[in-house]
Amino acid sequence: MSPAPPLSARAPRLSARALVRRFGGVTALDQVSLDLPPGRITALTGHNGAGKSTLFRCLSGADRPDSGQVLLDGRDITHLPEYTRARLGLARTFQQIAVFPGLSVADNLRVGAEQAGRRGSLEADFAVARTLRLLGLDHLADRPASGLPTGTLRLVELGRALSAEPGVLLLDEPAAGLDRAESERLAVLLTALAADGLAVLLVEHDRELVDRIADRVLTMSAGRLLPADGELPSATPIATAPSDGTADGA
C-alpha cells in the first residue's frame, strides 16, 4: 500500500474561485482565488480597506460575492448560509469578541457544538469536554463569561469554534487584546491544531505571530491577492460538485 500523501499535498479543504464583490462603485474583491489545504496555516495581511474582511465574510457565509465560487471539499457552498456551512465543517471567530456573557464557559462552547448539529447529544458533551481540556479551561467550565479577562474570552470564543470539530477554521484577529504570554499560548495551540490536519486562515496584524506560525503569508491590496513566491495563491483548479443552488435570501 502506498503511503498517504502529506496533508499539504492533498486537495484543499476550502477554496475561493475568482471572487468579485462590489459595493456601489468600489470593487472590494477583484477576481480573488485562494486554496486552504489541510494541515497548514495561511495568514492574510494587508492594509485597512485592502479587502481582507470582505474575503473573510464571503468565505464564512456572512456575505455573498457578486460572482465566483466558494468551495468546501469541492462542493459549491457559495449560496449556503453560515449555519449550513458550520454543519459542513467550517467554523470562524470574530474580530470583536463574540461570546454570550450570561452563559457559562462550557455553555458558550456548547453553542458551537450545537451549531454543528450536535444539539442535546452525548457527542456534544464529549466535544465540549475535549475542547475545555485542550484550551485549559476545565477549571472555568461553570464560570459565567461575563467578567473574564480578554485573553480568556478569546479562548472561549476559539473554543466555541473548535467544539464544532471543524475541518476549516477562519480566525479574524485572534490575538487582538492578548498579552505576550497569551499570544505565545495561542501560537502553540494553532500550530498543534494545524499539525492535526485543520486548515486555518488567519487574518492578523500581529506580524510576530504571523511569522512564527504561518506556513504561507498572502497579502491583499486593492481587492487583489498579490502573487506569493512567484505564483498566484491559487494556481491549480480542482474538480467541483454541482452547486446546490440553495440560498438564504441574501
Predicted feature locations:
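The feature captures the beta-strand-to-loop junction immediately N-terminal to the Walker
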Residues: 45-47
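Helix-to-loop junction immediately C-terminal to a conserved catalytic motif
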Residues: 60
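ABC ATPase NBD coupling module
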Residues: 76-96, 121
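Conserved ABC ATPase "signature" region
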Residues: 123-140, 188-191
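Catalytic Walker B motif of ABC-type/P-loop ATPase nucleotide-binding domains
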Residues: 169-173
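H-loop/switch region of ABC-family ATPase nucleotide-binding domains
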Residues: 204-205
